[in-house]
From Swiss-Prot:
GO biological process per UniProt: epidermal growth factor receptor signaling pathway; positive regulation of cell population proliferation; positive regulation of DNA binding; positive regulation of MAPK cascade; regulation of receptor signaling pathway via JAK-STAT
Extent of Polar residues compositional bias: 1158-1176
SUPFAM superfamilies: EGF/Laminin, Growth factor receptor domain, YWTD domain
Signal peptide: 1-18
Gene behind this protein: EGF
Localization per Swiss-Prot or TrEMBL: Membrane
Main localisation: membrane
Name recorded for this polypeptide: Pro-epidermal growth factor
Topology versus the membrane: Single-pass type I membrane protein
Cysteines paired by S-S bonds: 320-332, 327-341, 343-356, 362-373, 369-382, 384-397, 403-414, 410-423, 425-438, 441-453, 449-463, 465-478, 747-758, 754-767, 769-782, 838-849, 843-858, 860-871, 877-891, 884-900, 902-913, 919-932, 926-941, 943-954, 978-992, 986-1003, 1005-1014
Gene Ontology CC terms, in alphabetical order: plasma membrane
Membrane-spanning intervals of the chain: 1034-1054
Length: 1216
């Protein structure tokens, strides 16, 4: 188990190196001979220190923070640095002094006096020693950092110079010169094992070490001094390599870091940066004008002075390091003889002497707070209750009594105290020394934080970053994580790319471009969109320049601005010739006019997809900055005053700030999205700004006065840096990075390139594999675990789920292979100041300044002619020097070139024109049953062997077929299947179809998804179906309740029937069983006889009313009639009202229809027996069913009603 850990332990702590172009998010170089790697760790930004004249300067690798550290360092300076001590040490041979200063330029002091003829110096940062060589005495001396305890390390050397050491490997290197021969030497730090690495007949003038790759570099001059070269070898003197591509003739000094070499030359006041292996990716840092070139150069970074491994420390240091293992969360005190653990202020050592514990200052009442104290790790702060504020001393609380008027001009607020009015600050801010200004989160500089300022206490705060950004070591700046960002910009005749520090400067598209001012990038499909002002069309292409396709070819006049809505998948452009703003989807379909009223000369345009707003500049009669919704409604004027030619415009999506520039006024301004808090960032020193971009902490804009790209701080407008290099009219700047356009979904396009699962994280596509698979080495495909060899740990295959580096690249993998060696290599120049050799020459806009030494000349660009100061366009079409095919195209002249405009029926790339097969593509107008035949530049329609006109319908010779409705056809109801090239166009199982009526491809989305490509989840559908689900649940519950109630009612009804039946069987007697009490022997009436003649059973339904009175009695009726029982005491003839039995409650036949059935016995009859047998309960409005068999007379029911009170009429029906 321990063996793999031991093997992998060095790998875990190695950081690989890819690039050094981001000043705030630097990748740590990998310690390997190849010098190649991938971004893996983050370190502080490196910077340069160099001598220039008699001063020492520092500058960032991007040209920022150029400042003087030492004003009078001496004429010939030999220097080195100690990173942990943050010091620069230098030797002034003329004054014979060793001096030092902090890296920030403070506390300059003399260390000691030294002897004459010092020819080289280096610092041993591990043993805390200074080593220098004396060329005349032939010795190398070692002293401590104060210049004391000197001892000679090496003697009897031949003119030693250019000392360099590697304390990790414990080697010292130096150069010597004897007669006409030069040589390189090596020894260990004990002064033994001296070895000659190389001997040459030429002079060696400078030596530098690459401590990361363990390489030795040196500058070698020819004897006559006419040329020089840079060589390298390993620490043993083997593998000597000549850097052929570094073609400068007068190398002076150099330094190395990672994959780059930094060097200066004798004749130019510049510092060059190039790839140390190939000599390419050259960048020139142009310094202030001076009559001397930069002298010694050193790159400052902690990786250039790494910590030592075990075995390289001094004995005392070893002991402290061994003791340090017992100190947890503390430090080892090296000044103590016991080498015990020590703790920082605010902590105390634990009883076992190994831990540092926090001291609770609030518990000891020695904090000095008047009302409240809050302990925090390592410190504390005072608090105040509600209604009180903490005074600036941070201890006392005072009741909040506002000053009558803010006469003290406090930046925040004022409180009235016994000592008078005092300014105070909100939580997270402190009062400055002036007693009025607050610094912290409430200050204009946001507490020095580039993004978030987070209050920690009333007097402290810390900086934070938005998701996707990393806080840098300065604890203030935020840098974007992920791949290295770069710039895209239209350069009039071509499209170029460049990293922020000027490296990787090249051309992306250059063939048949015409004039291009409008450009933008789609991060989802990784394509660029650009508009031609001369050719009057809009194109798009891949990032490697391939697959160019025209989107808008008609109705375009002067498109000068273009913006991509990467979320809603549309793009918008300004047309100053037609004075309108238009938009369409990313395929050029569904074109619509957005703004056409009250607009004069629109130029720059930007879109905010999250805010659903468009922003644009208008350079016309009423110059202004405006915005509207994406549909062109809700227009809002952002700015209309102090504007002349507002040109470029851009949006900071992190802070929701709007930036624009005015070409005529030469100003850069910013404001909120609604136009509030408008302020100027820069003025007068920005040339003629044309286009803008913003990312991280900087604003980029192009300058047409001195064709270049300038960068300033986006909050202050300071730290101006100019990038230039053979530029014409740079415009439409675009920053390419996943976080530059937040919210992009790269997984929407071709599943992000992933074979299985694609997940988006901060704008990048992360590929995952399903269970049972692992990622292939390309990071996109998946390999099955069964039957495939899984790459071993440490191989090139990344089996994790992290995003692979380089997902966003300025070019495709094979782009460099297509570049011929003869292609001109672009060289970017970082200009610290605007003073350069080309400034007084005054080259034409269409010319390039070529500076060689003290001379500078102007050369007209390709496609132009002149003396360089005046250049004129060459009309290639008129001169007949084009290659446009005359039969299929027309030559159109552009500035610096030409374009072959294809004739109707042809399509091309601007040079070549190919015939369009209208028949195959379905672009013909042949009628039904006609045969389309393609021709060169045209097509014909044939009807049964005879020629027909386009649109003519041919007679059908075959009977029409009637397909079944459920059959599948490629064309139905104006819809047609999409071609195979559109596979994957519709996402989430959507079905692609082509709608002929509108000439557009559309997606039929499955339920739950919406959007042009079904890329969005339908939240309304989800909410609607969630509501329907809840309704269905409620309905199910309601149905269940109803069923239960019905079952309960049925149970109650059955119980009631059973009880009624039981009571009837006990209490009711058959009227036919007992004789009449009155002894009546009268003959039954006709109706009674008629009723008695029926053998089937009968039952009576009696409907009672509330006002049924005593004495009411039912009447004997004929079959099928009803009687109204009126208010009477004895039956009277003619008092019965007969009605139809169908309209009232009835006397029903057939016992199965009743609620209950009487006994079926057939016994004696008579009214007397009925009177004694029936008992009618007094239920209100309730029908009562009574079963009888062959009743003789209904008059026998009279006794049943004699005891009741009089009621309203009662109706009965008798039905057979």
């Amino acid at each position: 188990m321990l063996l793999p850990l031991i093997i992998l332990w060095p790998v875990v702590f190695k950081c690989s190196f890819a690039s050094l172009s981001d000043p705030e998010n630097w990748n740590c170089p990998e310690v390997s001979p190849s010098g190649k790697g991938s971004p893996a760790c983050v370190g502080p930004a490196p910077f340069l220190i160099f001598s220039h004249g008699i001063s020492i300067f520092r500058i960032d690798l991007e040209g920022t923070n150029h400042e003087q550290l030492v004003a009078d360092a001496g004429v010939s300076v030999i220097m080195d640095f100690h990173y942990n001590k943050e010091r620069i040490y230098w030797v002034d041979p003329e004054r014979q002094l060793l001096q030092r200063v902090f890296l920030n330029g403070t506390r300059q002091e003399r260390v000691c006096n030294i002897e004459k003829n010092v020819s080289g110096m280096a610092i041993n940062w591990i043993n805390e020693e200074l080593i220098w060589s004396n060329q005349q005495e032939g010795i190398i001396t070692v002293t401590d950092m104060k210049g004391n305890n000197s001892r000679v390390l090496l003697r009897a050397l031949n003119y030693p110079a250019n000392v360099a050491i590697d304390p990790i490997e414990r080697f010292i290197f130096w150069s010597s010169e004897v007669a006409v021969a030069g040589s390189l030497h090596r020894a260990d730090l004990n002064g033994v094992e001296e070895k000659i690495l190389l001997q040459t007949s030429e002079r060696i003038t400078a030596v530098s070490l690459d401590v990361l790759d363990k390489q030795l570099f040196w500058i070698q001059y020819s004897r006559d001094g006419s040329n020089s070269h840079i060589y390298s070898c390993n620490y043993d003197g083997g593998s000597v390599h000549l850097s052929k591509h570094l073609t400068q003739h007068n190398f002076f000094a150099m330094s190395l870091f990672g994959n780059q070499i930094f060097y200066s030359t004798w004749k130019k006041k510049t510092i060059w940066i190039a790839n140390k292996h190939s000599g390419k990716d050259m960048v020139r840092i142009n310094l202030d004008s001076s009559f001397v070139p930069p002298g010694g150069i050193k790159v400052v970074h902690p990786l250039l002075q790494p910590k030592a491994e075990s075995g390289t420390w001094a004995p005392d240091q070893k002991l402290c390091k061994w003791k340090q293992g017992n100190c947890r969360g503390s430090t080892c005190g090296q000044d103590s003889k016991s080498y015990s653990c020590t703790c920082a202020e605010g902590y105390t050592l634990s009883q076992d002497g190994k831990y540092c514990e926090d001291v609770n200052e609030c518990a000891f009442w020695n904090h000095g707070c008047t009302l409240g104290c809050e302990n925090i790790p390592g410190s504390y702060y005072c608090t105040c209750p509600v209604g009180f504020i903490l005074l600036p001393d941070g201890k006392r609380c005072h009741q909040l009594i506002a000053c009558p008027s803010n006469t003290s001009k406090c930046s925040h607020d004022c409180v009235l105290t016994s000592d008078g009015p005092i300014c105070f600050c909100p939580e997270g801010s402190v009062l400055e020394a002036d007693g009025k200004t607050c610094s912290g989160c409430s200050s204009p500089d946001n507490g020095g934080c580039s993004q978030l300022c987070l209050p920690l206490s009333p007097v402290s705060w810390e900086c934070g970053c938005f998701p996707g950004y990393d806080l840098q070591l300065d604890k203030q700046s935020c840098a974007a994580s992920g791949p290295q960002p770069f710039l895209l910009f239209a350069n009039s005749q071509d499209i170029r790319h460049m990293h922020f520090d000027g490296t990787d400067y090249g051309t992306l598209l250059s063939q048949q471009m015409g004039m291009v001012f409008a450009l933008d990038h789609d991060p989802v499909e990784n394509k660029i969109y650009f508009a031609h002002t001369a050719l009057k069309w809009i194109e798009r292409a891949n990032m490697d320049g391939s697959q160019r396709e025209r989107l808008i070819e008609e109705g375009v006049d002067v498109p000068e601005g273009l913006a991509i809505d990467w979320i809603d998948r549309k793009f918008y452009w300004t047309d100053s010739g037609k004075s309108l703003i238009e938009g369409s989807d990313l395929n050029g379909k569904h074109r619509e006019i957005i703004i056409k009223e009250d607009i004069s000369q629109p130029r720059g345009i930007a879109v905010h997809p999250m805010a659903k707003r468009l922003f644009w500049t208008d350079m016309g009669i009423n110059p202004r900055i405006e915005s509207s919704s994406l549909q062109g409604i809700g227009r809002l004027v952002i700015a209309s005053s102090d504007l002349v030619w507002p040109s470029g415009i851009t949006i900071d999506y992190v802070t929701d700030k709007l930036y624009w520039c005015d070409t005529k006024l030469s100003v850069i301004e910013m404001a909120n999205l609604d136009g509030s808090k408008r302020q100027r960032l820069a003025q007068n020193d920005v040339g003629h700004p044309f286009a803008m971009a913003v990312f991280e902490d900087h604003v980029w804009f192009s300058d047409w006065t001195m064709p270049s790209i300038i960068r300033v701080d986006k909050r202050t407008g300071k730290n101006r840096v100019r990038l230039r290099g053979s530029m014409l009219k740079p415009s439409s700047l675009v920053v390419v990075h996943p976080l530059a356009k937040p919210g992009a979904q790269p997984c929407l396009y071709q599943n992000g390139g992933c074979e299985h699962i694609c997940k988006e994280r901060f704008g990048t596509a992360q590929c995952l594999c399903r269970e049972g698979f692992v990622k292939a080495p390309d990071g996109k495909m998946c390999l099955a675990l069964n039957g495939h060899q899984i790459p071993a740990v440490g191989s090139e295959a990344d089996l994790s789920n992290h995003v692979t580096p380089g997902d966003v690249l300025p070019r495709s993998e094979g782009f460099e292979d297509n570049i011929t060696e003869s292609q001109h290599m672009l060289v970017a120049e970082i200009m610290v100041s605007d003073a350069d050799d080309c400034a007084p020459v005054g080259c034409s806009t269409w010319a390039e300044c070529v500076s060689e030494g003290e001379n500078a000349t102007c050369q007209c660009l390709k496609g132009f002619t002149g003396d360089g100061k005046l250049c004129f366009d060459i009309d290639e079409c008129e001169m007949g020097i084009t290659i446009c095919p005359p039969t299929s195209s027309k030559c159109v002249n552009t500035e610096g070139g030409y374009v072959c405009q294809c004739s109707e029926g042809y399509r091309g790339d601007g040079i070549h024109c190919l015939d369009i097969n209208e028949c195959q593509l379905g672009m013909h107008t042949c009628g039904e049953n006609a045969t389309c035949t393609n021709m060169e530049g045209n097509y014909t329609c044939m009807c049964a062997g005879s020629l027909s006109e386009p649109g003519q319908i041919c007679a059908d010779s075959t009977p029409p077929s009637h397909p079944m409705e459920d059959s599948h056809y490629s064309v139905r109801n104006g819809y047609r299947e999409c071609p195979s090239s559109y596979d994957g166009y519709c996402l989430y199982n959507g079905v692609c179809m082509y709608i002929e009526a509108v000439d557009r491809y559309a997606c039929n989305c499955v339920f739950g998804y919406v959007g042009e490509r079904c890329q969005h989840r339908d939240l309304k559908w989800e909410l609607r179906h969630a509501g329907q689900g809840r309704q269905r649940q409620v309905a199910a519950v309601a149905v269940g309740v109803v069923v239960l109630v019905l079952l309960l009612l049925l149970g109650l009804g059955g119980a009631h029937c059973y009880r009624t039946k039981k009571l009837s069987s006990k209490n009711l007697k058959n009227p036919y069983e007992e004789p009449s009490r009155e002894g009546s022997s009268s003959r039954p009436s006709d109706s009674e006889a008629r009723m008695a003649s029926f053998p089937q059973p009968w039952f009576v339904v009696i409907k009672e009313h509330q006002n049924l009175r005593n004495g009411s009695q039912p009447m004997a009726l004929k079959d099928g009639e009803s009687a109204d029982v009126s208010q009477f005491s004895s039956p009277e003839p003619g008092s019965v009202k007969r009605t139809s039995w169908r309209n009232e409650h009835q006397l029903y036949k057939d016992t199965e229809q009743g609620c209950c059935t009487p006994p079926s016995s057939n016994r004696g009859t008579g009214s007397q027996s009925m009177e004694q047998s029936f008992s009618v309960p007094s239920y209100e409005a309730q029908p009562i069913a009574l079963g009888v068999e062959k009743p003789q007379s209904l008059l026998s029911a009279k006794p049943l009603l004699q005891q009741r009170a009089p009621d309203p009429p009662h109706q009965m029906k008798l039905i057979q």
